[in-house]
């Protein structure tokens, strides 16, 4: 089991928590959307991204008890959001695909996590000191970015170029 420590809020042995780094990802996304005037175009029907985020979150918890569908979720992010361009201003307008943006951010989160574990700032139970975290953690960060991103878009909808009238209402 990946969570040997005692916890106050637990479902089937998996702690429910939102740690500093997890909350920071959502805060970072909200902030850079505003700072760099980011637009996401074309954006798929909003409800589909909500379903994807829910599936990712459920897999984070359930993969300890049922088959892990992470590879399917990776593919779903590319299929659903592969055409979505992240358009931002940094002197002039630039853009690249949303999955590439998520991959870049997940790499830097993984790097920060490794720096934290190598310096002893953060440790995992059962891991030796100064242990390098696996690339699987980068995959987890990649998926977490979509959960955080969709959570932010529940509040900040303006940057999304949604072409679907059935999108979840803002109220």
What are these model-derived regions, one by one?
Residues 1-171:
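Aromatic-rich, lipid-facing transmembrane alpha helices and their immediate juxtamembrane interface loops
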């Amino acid at each position: 089991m990946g969570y040997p420590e005692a916890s106050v809020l637990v479902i089937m042995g998996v702690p429910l928590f939102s740690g500093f780094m997890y909350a920071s990802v959502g805060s970072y996304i909200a902030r850079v959307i505003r700072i760099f005037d980011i637009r996401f175009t074309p954006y798929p029907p909003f409800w589909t991204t909500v379903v994807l985020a829910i599936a990712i979150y459920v897999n984070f918890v359930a993969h300890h008890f049922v088959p892990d569908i992470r590879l399917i979720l990776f593919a779903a992010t590319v299929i659903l959001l592969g055409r979505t361009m992240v358009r931002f201003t940094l002197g002039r307008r630039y853009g690249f695909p949303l999955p590439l943006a998520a991959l870049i951010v997940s790499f830097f989160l993984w790097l920060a996590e490794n720096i934290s574990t190598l310096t002893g700032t953060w440790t995992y139970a059962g891991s030796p000191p100064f242990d390098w975290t696996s690339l699987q953690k980068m995959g987890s960060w990649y998926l977490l970015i979509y959960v955080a991103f969709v959570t932010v878009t529940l509040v900040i909808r303006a940057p999304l170029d949604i072409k679907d009238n059935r999108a979840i209402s803002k109220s």
